[in-house]
Amino acid sequence: MSDDFSVFWRNNERASALFYDLLARAKRGAYDDDFLAQLAAYREAEPTSERADIFAAKYLLHHGDAENAAVCAERAYRKRPVNYEVWLLLADLYARLNRPIDALIMQGYAYGLYGAPQFSFHLDEDQLREGLGRLSIALGMGKGAPLAKVRAVIREQGLQFSTDLFIGEPLPLTMPPHYSRFWAASYTDYYLSDQGIMLDHNRHTDAFSTYGYRAASFQLQQAEEVRGPSEIQIPAETTAIVPIAGTSHLQKLTITNAGASHPLYLGKWAFSLFRLEGSAHITPADDRPYAIGTPIPLGHSPARRKLVLNILVDGLSWGVIRACFAECMPNTARFFARGTIFDQHFSVSEFTYPSLPTIETGRYPAHTQVFNENDSHELPLDIKTLSESMADLGYYTAAPLGAADCIYSGAMRGYRTLNAAPWTLPSADMAERTIRQIEAFNETDQFLYLHTADVHPWNPKGFKFYPATETHLPLTQRVFEVDENVTSVHLAQLPVYQDHFWRSLSCVDRHLGYLFSYIEAHFDERDILVSLYSDHGNSVFTMPVKGSVDVIAENATHAVWMMRGAGVPEGHIVSELTSTADLYPTLGTLCTFPVADDIDGNLPAVFGGKERDAVYSMSMFPGQTYKLAVRTHDHALRLETQEKVDEDGTVDFADARVGIYPRTHELDENYVVDSAELRAFFCPRARDFVREIANNGEFWPSMRAARPEWFGGQP
């Protein structure tokens, strides 16, 4: 690459030549000493490439060393977990190593995304439930838990698939040590069994899988499923709250606690809460299973706050509301006037699925590898999530209302209770549920996560706009043709979307005001830490560029972040650049949990850290060009690749279009700024940011051939 940065990216031609030479040798099965020599040269040329590990695994497998081949393949999987070649390799290796469930998971990933190869497996009777459950998740999308795009079952005809969900059972996910799996139940405030009975009736219908799921609400509780008598272990002289759910209507148990026995009547797939003094014994009336949630011990600690509250307002753009914040969100503005507001805060991603794991881990999507919503791989357990870290401190971690987007990926695995909605996240429910949650568990320290999508734009076909929007807009602005396949980030700048946004924003603020008033009336300032933030901005206030929506424009990525409570400076509007990755280390500092050295998040200077010199927003969506914005206070480098992003998140940066602009005129070619000083600042940072997803023009033929609409059918 040239020293003057006049060319942004040059591929390593020697490494590319070595890759294609190794590819040709592998195709011939020529795994000899010359192959090893070429592999050594390739690894020297590309020391961090997962492709070298794939070739090493193929070599070892050819020579009968499946165990060490798996070590290499798993190293490749750690870096590139959404990769067809890696999946095929691991499926073969795990089968050879007598790891049939792991092999089946890899087959599921491959078939779910590419439709091949056909399944080949053998599971023992005691492996069927786990294996088929894992396969069902692997075949489906990464969002929507506990829904299953397809559910794998064994019938007389063999392996069959049906529309379904996980309900009244544990989610087959990998949990941290000493954590129980999420047991999937319905969420209900009234009659215990009604929702469960309706779900049981509708779960396999097209009507539910296509429409009904949008109104469904679930409660995922870390719990153990048991049959027969059981013991609930609680230390002596300790009071704890224990969630218990049944699997049938009015399921009867007898519970013995503190020397007395009591009858319990449970609902079908619904949790009820019980206060216990010390350990308890349960005697069921029959052998039907039931679920016992992880006990929640009561008690406060001076090392913790009584309430740490995170509120995600999905799609709220600070760039849109900053000039009128006090007028359009008066309750929120009043509450956070006693805290700190970040004025230059940007999301890393343009939509929720990759953005939420960034917030929950402090890592960019290149490091979480959660970016492809058609894949459901899990975060490695050594990536500690925000909820896990808070649970380690002794907080009761719960989400009174949360999206179902990132449960399968593991980004939400530290929440003991997670009320998940696949689609509908109204702020009215959010506020009321939160107050009920705080009241119910006011004898313990709580870390709560909330998520509302009221202001998020949706494709208008079949969507119900805010009532006042429908009654006040004339037909010329209210009714129009639209492609039902247009995603929210590509919605145009139209009056109906904008009017819906402003009216919904007032609704959100009204309900937040209700919640904030409750908090101020019941907590001292030293006992709270409240954060309000968004995961991305909003496309419907973004000017089109050459007829297309700029999905990482300022208004689409200029996000919201404000904090109030113990340790937060009061009355500050901070101009330093911040990222959605920065919430994680900030809470680590304020709440005193350890933060790994290798995260991407930065502790803001206002909390004792160091100011960022740039902030990054990008779009890493398979089948679309990769886009990047590197912003300072005054300028922005904008990049777009010529080629589309592959399913594994990699892309070729050769010939990428790059320009530097004033922040106020991004992508306006009349304002391009081309100076050696700016190139020397921006280009090294942009290169470092994209380096881990740059494929150097090296492609696996099987992946290219599977996406002719993206790559023209050329390997």
Residue ranges of model-derived segments:
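Canonical positions in the second alpha-helix
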Residues: 41-42, 75-76, 110
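Short coil turns that delineate tetratricopeptide repeat
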Residues: 46-48, 81, 114-115
